[in-house]
Each structure stands twice: as C-alpha cells, then as structure tokens.
Amino acid sequence: MESKSPGYITPKKPALSASARKIKDNAADWHNLMLKWETYNNDSFNIASKIVNLKITAESADRMLLDEPSPNKDNITTDKVELDRLCSELLQTIENMEKIWTKMEKITATFKGICDLEAYQFPGDTSKPTHFHTWPTTLFYETSMKMVDMYKKEIQLKRTIVGDLAHTSDQDLRMVYLSCWLYQPYIDNNIKVLLESMLLETGHRPI
C-alpha cells in the first residue's frame, strides 16, 4: 500500500475585526488623500506663479503706457481676462484641497468613534485590544489629530494668500506668498514618518 506524505496546511491569518478593518482602511485613505493634496498643491503653486508673473507684466506695461499717447487697450483687457481666469482656477483648486481636509477630519472622527466604543466595551482599567502589532487605538487617533491639525493650519494660510495674492503690489510679499505655498510651513517634515508608521502598523508596509 502506497504511503502518503503528510500534508502541510499554511495557517490562515486571523480575520480582522470590524474596528481593525476600519482602522486599516483609514490608514490607506490617509495615504491616498495626502498624495492628492500634494498634486493639488503643486498645481495650485503653478497657477499662483502665473498670477504673480501676469501681475508683474501688467504693472510693467502700466508704467510703459504712461509714456505712450495711445495705449493698447486690447492687451490690457486680455491680461485682465486671463488674471480673472487664473484666480478662479486657483479658488477652485483651494476648494478641492478643502474637501480633502474635510475627508481627513472625517477619518479622525472615525478613529475617535472607535476609541469611544472601546472605552465603553472595556471600561476602567480593563485591557483594550491591540488590533495589529503594538499600537493602541488611541495612538491612531492621536496621530491622525496631529496630521489633520497641520492641514487645517495650512489651508487657512492658503486662504489668506489667495485673498491677497492678486491684489498686493509688494513684489517681496508676493515672493513670500509663493514660497509659503510651495513649502507649506505648517506641514511638518515628520508627517511622512507619522504616516509611514501608521502604514507599517496596519500592514500596508512590510516590517
């Protein structure tokens, strides 16, 4: 009788709880939203740069027109139309960035909801579950809060810049605005570390 080799069964990973699945989805959503934000930030910086360059050109033309007996009104009208178009485009991009920030806020609220649920299910000093490796659920919430607060301050700064960029005649201030827009002073360099730590903890990145 032919002997059979013993079969080896690869143990299955335990199924994630509903809370763990939501936390993992939230971490992925954070990653995707941050990528979208960076795309919008680069696009809006290019638009803002065009606005500044157009304003510089228009101001130079205004000075030249003072010496001309018959100014070219067509060029003036064309520049104004283009400036209005760029300003509208910049405002639309900012609105898209605000929508991203709103989604980040909702993710943070979801983390808070999971924390509240676990506090109810495991009251007092009762040990609360660790869904992945080492992070308690509260750490996901705290990390999300840190990140969303950075984006909140950044969107407020951008709103201020948008309100003044096309109107100020101070060239140095324009350059400061553009620099702030590109380098996003309220978003700390360690935000990538925070995100990557979250992705590592939830298994989106190999350890």
UniProtKB/Swiss-Prot annotation:
One of its GO terms (biological process) is ribosomal large subunit biogenesis. Disulfide bonds: none annotated. One of its GO terms (cellular component) is nucleus. InterPro entries: Cyclin-dep_Kinase_2_interact. Keywords: Cell cycle, Cell division, Coiled coil, DNA damage, DNA repair, DNA replication, Nucleus, Ribosome biogenesis. Its main location: nucleus. Residues 78-99 form a coiled coil. GO terms for molecular function: preribosome binding. It is found in: Nucleus. PANTHER family: CYCLIN-DEPENDENT KINASE 2-INTERACTING PROTEIN. Component of the DNA replication complex, which interacts with two kinases, CDK2 and CDC7, thereby providing a functional and physical link between CDK2 and CDC7 during firing of the origins of replication. Regulates ATR-mediated checkpoint signaling in response to DNA damage. Part of the 55LCC heterohexameric ATPase complex which is chromatin-associated and promotes replisome proteostasis to maintain replication fork progression and genome stability. Required for replication fork progression, sister chromatid cohesion, and chromosome stability. Homodimer. Part of the 55LCC heterohexameric ATPase complex. Belongs to the CINP family. This is Cyclin-dependent kinase 2-interacting protein. It comes from Xenopus laevis. The gene is cinp.
